[in-house]
Amino acid sequence: MSKEKFQRVKPHINVGTIGHVDHGKTTLTAAITTVLSKKYGGSARAFDQIDNAPEEKARGITINTSHVEYDTELRHYAHVDCPGHADYIKNMITGAAQMDGAILVVAATDGPMPQTREHILLGRQVGVPYIIVFLNKCDMVDDEELLELVEMEVRDLLTQYDFPGDDTPIIRGSALKALEGDADWESKILDLSKFLDTYIPEPKRAIDQPFLLPIEDVFSISGRGTVVTGRVERGIVKVGEEVEIVGIKKTTKTTCTGVEMFRKLLDEGRAGENVGVLLRGTKRDEIERGQVLAKPGSIHPHTTFESEVYVLSKEEGGRHTPFFKGYRPQFYFRTTDVTGSIELPEGVEMVMPGDNIKMTVTLIHPIAMADGLRFAIREGGRTVGAGVVSKVLV
C-alpha cells in the first residue's frame, strides 16, 4: 500500500454541555464558539441561534438538540447543547449524541441543584467517560469562601457517582461576561479549551476495536456456503480469520472464508462498511438475524441486565397508560426484537409515559451485549421507550 498523503486534520472529539436549568449551558456554548472563533477561526454562534434547537429523531424519539463546532489549539470539537431538561435525558439515553466527555455547568450563585445530580447520575449510567466542570456566574460572587464551598460540593457529588471528584478540572468563569468580550473572562474560556484538549483523551476509533457485525440477513449460496450480511459496527474482519457467532443460541466458532461488498471480493471488511461474510461449514439454519459475528471472546451473550430507560410520552407516540411490574414488551437490540420482562426499583409501582426510570430486564433469549449497549422498547412494532444497558448481570 502506498503511503497516505499527509492531511492537516485535527483529531475529532464529541462533547456536550450538561447541568441544571438556567445555570448557563447555552450561554457557555455561545461563549465558547465566540471566544475560540476569534483565536482559532470558525464561526461564532449567538445564544438565540443555539437555543432555537431543531428537532431530531433518534430511535423513534423526537429530541431538540443544537450542534455547534469549534476548534481549539489541538482538536476539532462537535458540541451538543439541549434546550430542555427532558431533551437531555432523551439525548443521553438514546445516545443520539454520543459524548467523549461533558462540560458540567454549575452556577456559583446556586451550587449543585437537582438536575445537576441527575445529569451526573445519567452520565455515569450511560457511560459519559469524562466530566469537566465550568463554575459559571463567578462574576456575581465576591466571596472566595463561597466559591470554594460550591467547588467542594460539586467534587463530592462527582465522587458519589464514581467520577474522580478530587481530580476533576473546575474552571471558574462567567459565560455572559466572556460572551460580552471581557478579556479577563474570555481567558477562562481559553482555560476551559485547554482542559478539553488535555483532560479528555482521544477516543479509540471504531476501526481499532474488536470486530463486531450485527447480522441482518443470511443466505445460502450453492457450492460456496452460507453468507451473512450487515454493517460492520467496529473493527476489521479478514479472510481466513476465526469468528464467533454470538447470541440467541449457543455460541459457535467458524472461519471467514470470504468478504464481499457490492459483489466485489475483498480481503477484509472494515468498520462502517456494509458487507457479506462467507462462513466455512456453517449451515443456513444454524444462524439468524439478531445474532452477531464477532472476534472470539470479545463479547458474550446475556439475558439479564440493569438499564436506564426513557418512556415515550403519549404526545411522542408512546403509550397512553402507565405500565406495571411484569410488563413484557419487546426489546429491540441492533437488528432484532426479543421479548423480556421487567422489574422496577423498590417502592416503584408503575411507570408513566414521559418518565425516565432504572429497570432490570430479563430476556427470553440471550443477546450479545456489554454495558453501554442501546436498545428500543417496542410493542407491536411501535417504539414506546428507549434504553441503555447500564450493567450486565447474567
UniProtKB/Swiss-Prot annotation:
SUPFAM superfamilies: EF-Tu/eEF-1alpha/eIF2-gamma C-terminal domain, P-loop containing nucleoside triphosphate hydrolases, Translation proteins
Chain spans, region G2: 60-64
CDD domains assigned: EF_Tu (cd01884), EFTU_II (cd03697), EFTU_III (cd03707)
Gene3D superfamilies linked to this entry: P-loop containing nucleotide triphosphate hydrolases, Translation factors
Record region (G1): 19-26
Molecular function GO labels: GTP binding; GTPase activity; guanosine tetraphosphate binding; translation elongation factor activity
Stretches for region G5: 174-176
InterPro entries: EF-Tu_GTP-bd (IPR041709), EF-Tu_GTPase (IPR050055), EFTu-like_2 (IPR004161), EFTU_2 (IPR033720), G_TR_CS (IPR031157), P-loop_NTPase (IPR027417), Small_GTP-bd (IPR005225), T_Tr_GTP-bd_dom (IPR000795)
Residues annotated as domain tr-type G: 10-204
Residues the entry annotates as binding GTP: 19-26, 81-85, 136-139
Keywords: Cytoplasm, Elongation factor, GTP-binding, Hydrolase, Magnesium, Metal-binding, Nucleotide-binding, Protein biosynthesis
G3: annotated segments: 81-84
Enzyme type, top EC level: hydrolase
Classification via HAMAP family: EF_Tu_B
Family membership: Belongs to the TRAFAC class translation factor GTPase superfamily. Classic translation factor GTPase family. EF-Tu/EF-1A subfamily.
Quaternary structure and interacting proteins, as annotated: Monomer.
Protein name per its UniProtKB record: Elongation factor Tu
